[in-house]
Design a protein with these regions (language model features):
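A domain-level signal for the structural core that forms small-molecule/cofactor-binding pockets
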Residues: 1-63
């Protein structure tokens, strides 16, 4: 059972997140030959104030 976990900064629309879920699901199915029912894709949205890169939060960087 393939499990894919994705972390993204909060702020994207539900339709964008659903499109990502579907695209990743399809990529796993097509590349690994996994049955649809066995594929799990989880997106975790992280507050930009709680995610840092290069010593600055994403919020500070304007993302």
């Amino acid at each position: 059972m393939p499990i894919v976990r994705i972390s993204v900064a909060a702020g994207r629309s539900r339709s964008q997140l659903r499109a990502c879920l579907q695209a990743v699901h399809n990529a796993v199915r097509d590349s690994l030959g996994a049955p649809d029912a066995s594929i799990r894709v989880l997106i975790t949205e992280v507050d930009p104030d709680l995610w840092s890169s290069g010593g600055q939060t994403l919020a500070e960087r304007g993302r």
